[in-house]
Amino acid sequence: MTERLTRTVDISNQRGLHARASAKFVKLAATFDAEVKVTKDGSTVDARSIMGLMMLAAGLGCCIEISAEGPQAAEAIEALTQLVEDRFDEER
């Protein structure tokens, strides 16, 4: 059994986790051999679900927890955290 890794990250882009940002997150999450989940205010969704991510309503200033379990859990956490910290490559 593998350990579940978690990382908490702040949403810092102006539009938050909207459709385009969610699509980028889902696309990246799907590249890893890991089960990835995102939690906000006690609600947890599959990181490969655009609708699930959007339903979290994670706007500017919100805090989300990214968790992953599986062979590539550490890589998934690092890459997804970087994507969020880079504001989904939307703001330069």
Model-derived segments and spans:
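Compact, glycine-rich, soluble single-domain proteins
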Residues: S12-G59
